[in-house]
Amino acid sequence: MSPQQIQTAGINLSPQHNNTNNNNSNNNNNNNTNNNSNNTNNNNTNNNNNNNNNSNNNNINNNNNNNNTNTNANTNINNNNNNNNNNNNNNNNNNNINNNNNNINNNNINNNGNNVNLVNIGVPQLQQHLQGILSKQQLVNQQNSSIQQQIQQLANSIMITKQQIGQGQPNAQQQQQQLQQQQQLQNFQQLQQNLHNQGASLQSQAQQIQQMLNNNGNNLNNSNNNNNNNNSNSSSNNNNNNSSSNNSSSNNNSNNNNINNNNNNGNNNNNMGNNNNNMGNNNMGNNNMGNNNMNNNNMNNNNINNNNSNNNNNNNMNNNNNSNNNSNNMNNNNNNSNSNNNNNNNNNNNNNNNNMNNNNMNNNNNNNNNNMNNNNNNNNNNNNNNNNNNNMNNNNNMNMNNNMNNNNMNNNNNNNMNNNNMNNNNMNNNNMNNNNVNNNNMINNGQQPNQQQIQTGQSTNQQLHQQLQLLQQQQRASQQGFTPQQLQQLVNQPLTPFSNQIQNPFQQLPIQQPIQQLGNSGQFSNNNQNNMSNNGNNNNNNNSNNNINNNNNNNNNSNNNSNNNSNNNSNNNSNNNGNNNGNNNGNNNGNNNGNGNNNGNNNNNNNNNNNNNNNNYNPLNNNNIIGQNGMIINNSQILGSQNGVNNNNVQQFGNPQFFPYTQQPNQLPPNQQQNQSPQPSNMVSVSTTNINTNTSSPLSTDPSDEPSSKRVKKSSSKPSKSKGKK
């Protein structure tokens, strides 16, 4: 793969606002027909993503092992068996580590089923991820320096060879030596190109996270609410892509992986093609592995930046195929492989990534994505795929970041890589939001919360707090030597600069800096893929957490049958008509077809809003919503505050109030809130159109305390006659 192809495929920061518009137009075409089948197929997609996340968690812990493995993998086809063995060992190691990391990220949370923990951590998660980004920038710079040293050594070797040849003709051995040196030089150039892309990607990610931190993780979310709601319809378009068949669901994964892993595949392909002559060059293998590890960051960035472009491709193709569905599924595979990858080999490797992930997932989930996607390629390219999976492992911190991105960005960011653990969390968050939806429906219907519900919510909150403390302890234990003060210094220090030119004694590679300035909107509207994943994960997790989530879903269904049209219309009319179509079709179809589909679509649409409103500080939301404030909006916002109780608990960066359970003068710890008597008030249902999310006024239960533009009328919606489990 040429450097130009690497640039195009590795970091394709395509215009994102255009992608959002395309997604909206696709939404209108696809929502009515495909919402019903989307959820089931999304489960398969999310299963793949979850596998990716397991591997994502590995890389941070197994960088050295991965380097060794990549060295073996670079011995090319001749060492397939060895690579398989090594990769299997690494997979075993990764699995052991994944069990630990996933237990930290997922299992502890999933056991509760409510799974608000990672969402609740909020800003600390962003800080931890920014720490990881800064560490990875240092690693990229170190690797770039190492590559530069090796290029200099190679230059010396080439000069010595030329001096030995002199004016005469080289003999066969000298010709072979020159050929090997030229191949090594090309490999080094490719590695430097990839390192530069990775450095630019990391810098872009760090800028995004820093901007989120500067905005307390809230303003970006609020600015993206409309985009995210619009994207919820486009997520159903992506769901349509997945729903077109099991194959197309793995297509979407392969699309994301195609972009995400172009650099990885480029490295592997070039090394696979060239390292036959460099089998002894462990440094190259290690550097290549480092590149691949950093390419995972490109993958994350690409998932953020390029999902819209891929989604547009998928939507355009799947809009044509939606009417034909399964007949065109294989065509989707071919089209996706051609459009998303400038290189069929990369596409094979990416599909193999999916297949490898699917194989790992098959141990847990069955699942469909192995069906028609390149089983033969999987057999041929397991080495690359294992390495790619290991490369994706770098994303422990990215998982946290994506958790934050997902939560801050309507659960959208779970970009394939992180999507993946986050998808579980999103599912769980959605389940938690199901509880919020149940509470909202109950309150909007005019029912007063009883003491048992309040105590139950407070008890749940206390349990979540205890689990959060355990999770934070585990995460702190997994960190390597960063104190909160050092972390703040890392966050405040300028980002590591990365030169626009790669120093090379033989060839100057033109590098275009792909970093773009971030806007307040559109940057995260690329998360259509993630909304799709959230739908799928809702179904998955509903299946896995049926006891908890199905109860909530039943409540949602019973309430949604009477309330969804009014609630969704009131929320979505303020955003756009596309959402009305998506929500109404999704909810109506879901109600007609059963709880699974309805909850998938309903939770996706409603929970996008709920997550934005509640994510940064969810542990107190249920108690505050039911027990203290009582002024409920459909999206679980509380009048007089931003995002529920966020304003009271989230301030500028560096304030200890970022950490949810630091006791403040006016804030009781969760174990004492249980003793507070609730302050019931009249419950109202209002549109979010006139809510000023930038206000910092204290919580108020008196509508007269609000400006006239924010006063609300009581909802005329009648209480639902259906009764759900509390």
Swiss-Prot record:
Comp. bias (Low complexity): 18-109, 644-701
Signal sequence bounds: none
Domain of life: Eukaryota
Biased composition (Basic residues): 710-726
UniProt region (Disordered), positions on chain: 1-109, 214-461, 518-622, 644-726
Compositional bias (Polar residues): 1-17
Name assigned to this protein: Putative uncharacterized protein DDB_G0286901
Taxonomic source organism: Dictyostelium discoideum
Lineage of the species this protein comes from: Eukaryota, Amoebozoa, Evosea, Eumycetozoa, Dictyostelia
